[in-house]
Amino acid sequence: MRTIQLIAGLAAVGTMSMASPDAVAADQDRSRFSDEPAPLKIEDFPERPKPLLEIGDKFLGPGNLQKGFTLPTGAVWHPSLWVFGNYRSAIQTFDTGTARTTEWVNDLNLFANVQLAATERILVGFAPLRNDNGQFTGYNFEPNHRGVEDFNENSLHPRTFFFEGELGELFPRWDKSDRRSLDYGISLGRQPLTLQDGILVNDDSIDMVSITRNALLPGFGSHLRLSGIFAWNEIERGNNFEDRSAYLFGLDGFIDMPKSTVEADLLYLSSGTQVDGFFAGIGSIQRIGKIATTFRVNQSIAVEDPNVGIQSGTMLFAEMSLEPAYTHNVLYVNGYWGIDDFTSAVRGPLAGGPLGRTGLMFAAVGLGSYGSPLSNAGQRSAGGALGYQMFFGELRRRQLTFELGGLSPTDGRNGQATALGARFQQALGTRTVLVLDAFGALRENSRESFGGRMELLVKF
């Protein structure tokens, strides 16, 4: 017995001595994953963000789902109600160079989500502190001709009220073997609609129906999605004013290709009182080396004589961003070229112009009378923004962004403008964000423009 143990020990020593230096180095490499399973570290994991009210299954909660009930169609529903929303309150001043507005303004968005199943739900939303024209509740300090006054704007009309689901999940008995490819998404009611990153369409409340074919597998890509759109009410034209006689017809497409994601849209807007229009857009999203890029081309065509609601033109737009080495920060350069008088098909009253994605100096804040430092219409002009966004803290709960923006008319008009601005954001707790904005702008043949704001955003 002792002889056998001695032979085994000598064999083990021989095996270790014959191990290659590379194998030994690999075992001692600190970057090598351990063979021992590590426990899940949940001590520093944030608590579940409970909504304002939840009945039924918990939002992002652990445990089993309700048993539910079966519909005659075969669908199994287990309804749950989640009530959530956000509150925005800001003190802000905006000086255009000719007039100054200083105000305290508030907005409240409340939503009730009835989750019927994983793919079916009904969402109802209200904005009780603003009216249907996008005017908010608050207190006005300037201009003087308005006097110091409070303004109470409210509306109990639902800003959101729609149902969405999937045909195959609503009627599973039609295709028990899952061979008919009933992957058709359905959305009906008052809902937001954004196309081409908000350049072609940007409206937070439009009455529409859409039917979407998901999970198509073309030979030249991994995923193709096609949607048909029809809208009949709450349609604001490109000048942000509602056209009560307008109807919108559209096709929206999305495809994942080996090196790019491509979005394409084709729209026709018919009106009984204003000019009809054709609209088209195509965009490509990809990485070129270490640079994330987006390129978009959008076109508007007035069928008859153009007016403020629809004009003919082309908008070229590009975004580029990267993370500088050894940081988690973002350096970005965005630019546009507006050829003739491009007009968006649909723009909500708070959406501003089509160039909001160019940068902070072009974006509308969507709250009160605080405008964009630089014009975001983009007609017959070219411009862009250079910005640097920094993140601070282990959890990146603090951000600071500096941006330089500018534009110049391309038709010989006066109107060159340059703006420099900054935004600071700080997370407070798990539901609140403090936002500070400031800018200064120089415009050709005009006085300086400046503005600043402090906003508190609470999500619940």
Task: Give short role names for the model-derived ranges.
Residues S260-D305, A345-G429, V435:
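Outer membrane beta-barrel transmembrane domains
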Residues A38-I42, A99-W232, G452-R453:
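Outer-membrane beta-barrel channel domains
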Residues T70-T73, N109-F111, F162-E164, S210-T212, ...:
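Outer-membrane beta-barrel architecture
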